[in-house]
């Protein structure tokens, strides 16, 4: 009987923890940060924007949720999330960050978003966007790494020597800009979105390597070379005069030369 009571209590605890609660009325709270961080990690459906008119992290949340909001610095990382697992309805979670020129790595998860008019600029820039999250902003780097998964998205201009683009789980990237080397690992019905600028696709590279699989699609411009392996009904559309003899295709995949 005692074991049964304990088991029922545990089930009730999990059921309560999983309930959706009302976020409550919106309130705002400021959190002090040093500004020395180079990495940002955001979870739990926060909408993040960047401003040069604030000097603290400004959070807007429901008054029932605000006591559980965590904004903390750990080493070179700034972390923003909700303590414990909670699902809420009502007031949207928002965060306004002071502009930080040193920011070079952004990790978003749990349907979070990050929007900046200032972009990210560093020798190495890394984005890890997962769980239906999205990033809007430009990137300038020697080497840029973009990892998108779980129906996440990127929208911005990239200027880099090397761009590594890893996409999976129906993610999409709307990319413009010029890179010397483009390395693609695109799978699971993900898409580099068709984006035409001045009569050619807006993402331009000298050399493109990598793979497309699982009904994925990419649109790019190159006057150099494209050496990509395509499978599972994937398609690579390109403009320019790139050599494509190094490409391989299987499973109804193809490489398409588009002329506008």
Mark where each language-model region is.
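A residue-level signal for conserved active-site and pocket-lining positions in enzyme catalytic cores
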Residues: 44, 71, 131, 150, ...
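Sec-dependent bacterial lipoprotein signal peptides
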Residues: 1-17
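Acidic (Asp/Glu) and glycine-rich low-complexity loops/linkers
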Residues: 10, 19-128, 136-145, 155-157, ...
């Amino acid at each position: 009987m005692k074991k049964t009571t304990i088991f029922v209590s545990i089930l009730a605890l999990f059921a309560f923890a999983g309930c959706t609660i009302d976020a409550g009325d919106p309130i705002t709270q400021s959190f002090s940060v040093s500004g020395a961080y180079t990495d940002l990690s955001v979870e739990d459906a926060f909408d993040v924007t960047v401003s040069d008119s604030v000097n603290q992290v400004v959070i807007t949340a429901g008054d029932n949720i605000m006591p559980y909001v965590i904004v903390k610095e750990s080493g070179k990382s700034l972390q923003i999330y909700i303590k414990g697992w909670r699902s809420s309805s009502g007031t949207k979670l928002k965060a306004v960050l002071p502009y930080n020129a040193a920011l070079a790595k952004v990790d978003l998860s749990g349907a979070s978003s990050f929007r900046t008019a200032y972009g990210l600029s560093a020798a190495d820039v890394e984005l890890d966007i997962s769980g239906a999250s999205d990033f809007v902003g430009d990137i300038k780097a020697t080497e840029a790494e973009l990892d998108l998964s779980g129906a996440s998205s990127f929208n911005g201009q990239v200027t880099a020597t090397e761009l590594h683009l890893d996409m999976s789980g129906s993610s999409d990237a709307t990319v413009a800009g010029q890179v010397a080397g483009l390395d693609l690992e695109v799978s699971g019905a993900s898409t580099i979105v068709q984006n035409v600028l001045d009569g050619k696709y807006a993402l331009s590279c000298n050399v493109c390597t990598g793979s497309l699989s699982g009904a994925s699609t990419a649109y790019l411009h190159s006057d150099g070379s494209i050496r990509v392996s395509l499978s599972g009904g994937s398609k690579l559309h390109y403009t320019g005069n790139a050599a494509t003899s190094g490409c391989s295709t299987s499973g109804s995949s193809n490489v398409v030369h588009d002329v506008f």
